[in-house]
Amino acid sequence: MPTRRLLREEIGERGVQIYESRLRALLEPQFRGQFVAIDVESEDYEVANDAALARDRLWTRRPDSQILIERIGYPAAFNAR
């Protein structure tokens, strides 16, 4: 059954929650300044030096993913639908 497409705001809220609760402590010490693409449904993620590369790698594994991209160690995030 296909997953319902989320609104941009929902992707942002879920992605930030996943980053803050699961990934921040794991990723910031080693990957500060890189990008993490987070699938907000599966909570799978991919880290890369380039936002598009992180997104594309995650889409390769999860073609239907709904992705938030966060710069590790920085406050801004953006949606990569």
Show the residue positions of the predicted features.
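Amphipathic, hydrophobic secondary-structure cores in small proteins
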Residues: A25-P75, A80
